[in-house]
Amino acid sequence: MSNKTNNFPVHIFPKVVSDYINEYTVNNSFDPNYMSSAFISLVSTLIGGNYRAEVCKEWKEPPIIWNAIVGNSGDKKSPSVGLILKPLDDLNAELHRQYQAAYDEATDDEERRLIRAKQIVVGDITYESLIQVLNNNPFVLLNVDELLTLFSDGNRLSKNIDSLLSIFNQRPISLNRKTDSEKKLIRNPSLGLIGGFQHKLLDKFIGNGRMESGFVMRFLFTLRSEVRHKLIIKDANPKIVDDYTDFIAKLLTVQQYNTEIKDIPLNVEALEVFNDWRNINREVRDELKCGEMNEYLSKIEGYIPRLAIVVEMVDRVNNNDEIKIISKYAVERAIDLTAYYVANFEHLLKGSKIILGDANKKRSCVADLMKSLTPKVRKRTVKTLYDKGHSKVTISHSLGIPASTLNDQLSSERKNKGK
């Protein structure tokens, strides 16, 4: 399966990050799409237990991101992700060293029992162990090579999908042990998730009720980039690597333990752009006949504040500034990201036998909210939105229509109206 027209919008990143991704893409054939989504996971991990995006007093979104890295065997899914997440792995190792040192210095069992094991990344894990980790840490990233291992018969996480969905929404979860009276309650659980699966295993991933439960709909899907460079093995430019390492070091200072969650509001301009997009999204969903795509567009709405706070934090750290609000710039970049991920989801739907069934069965879905609409419907929708007062910038970002194309269409309509 190919995805020739949809590459990750790397323009959302500061130059220090995009240069690093490009350096390893050109010199060692790592995948820029996989690396870019992994960077989103990295940042969300560092801020997940400390910040939330505040749309309004009643609507707050935690920066919890679930990423599915999709490709074929040999596409460098895990190496590309691992290259970006290495700073988290290094931090994880240092946290374990500190824990072990404190444990060894403890003088009795009671003192040892009170020592909390700090972790920021976990791999294959049982549900009970996950609860313990979340109890000790404000945010954890579950990083697995193969997402399907989470749903194997021997993995108890597969039997706790409802609890995982609660974690995604940062709702309280608890664990009652049958062996004793101990009860653990996690009030603000934060669990990021990143892992891969092969295209040929798509139907296994979305099967067994995981699509119907909404579990699959919480994922952002990343497909392999179609950009190809000459195959070479070459050490990366040391300056580019050092600059990126320094930037990550600044990001690492954002992650804190034992702090209250800070709610970061969208400013007036950001909220206006977000509401414009929501209205456009609703009108596009009304045009759809594909139930799965309609539901995904509904779920993706909550991802815009989540992605926006990630973008805002990266921008603030890059400018050596403190995050206080979520800007219009961040929301527009988040809209760019959701357009990318929505297009990937549609691409996957087209390859699913479970969803599409008979090859002759036609279903109407969309790519980045508009691609599958007929030209006539597309033009009518653009005109309707513009007449309702939506800005050209918002329409362009939300519908994936180039600004030049949008301007040409509206200019043509004005000329025709004047005749």
Predicted segments — roles?
Residues 1-376, 380-383, 388-398, 402-407, ...:
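Phosphate-handling catalytic cores of nucleic-acid transaction enzymes
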